[in-house]
């Protein structure tokens, strides 16, 4: 007896069209274009979940660098001073501190500067 694929194919197409909901034009209406768009979107999502970690680290370093240069210290000198002072704040916390509480960040910079001098 021949196996007809009606139910299986319909479920597969409905699943893809559901994932493509909100895409523009034929990307959400026609199965073939929707399938291509969904595959591309899933690839981009996978890639960008990994890229996001790099991008945020770059942003934090840029913010820390700007804040430390305003205090007369370069980024690499600041990080070296933190390591020597045994201050274990990660870059995310340092960037938040520089952005939200500049006075506290100034104290951290001074501690790093003093540990570098000694």
UniProtKB/Swiss-Prot annotation:
Belongs to the bacterial ribosomal protein bL20 family. CDD domains: Ribosomal_L20. The gene is rplT. One of its GO terms (biological process) is translation. GO terms for cellular component: ribonucleoprotein complex; ribosome. Binds directly to 23S ribosomal RNA and is necessary for the in vitro assembly process of the 50S ribosomal subunit. It is not involved in the protein synthesizing functions of that subunit. This is Large ribosomal subunit protein bL20. One of its GO terms (molecular function) is structural constituent of ribosome. Pfam families: Ribosomal_L20. Keywords: Ribonucleoprotein, Ribosomal protein, RNA-binding, rRNA-binding.
């Amino acid at each position: 007896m021949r196996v007809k694929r009606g139910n299986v194919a319909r479920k597969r197409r409905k699943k893809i069209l559901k994932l493509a909901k909100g895409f523009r034009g034929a990307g959400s209406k026609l199965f073939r274009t929707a399938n291509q768009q969904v595959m591309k979107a899933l690839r981009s999502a996978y890639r960008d979940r990994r890229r996001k970690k790099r991008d945020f680290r770059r942003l934090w370093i840029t913010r820390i660098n700007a804040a430390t240069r305003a205090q007369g210290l370069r980024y690499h000198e600041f990080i070296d001073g933190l390591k020597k002072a045994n201050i274990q704040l990660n870059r995310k916390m340092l960037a938040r501190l520089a952005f939200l509480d500049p006075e506290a960040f100034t104290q951290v910079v001074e501690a790093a500067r003093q540990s570098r001098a000694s």
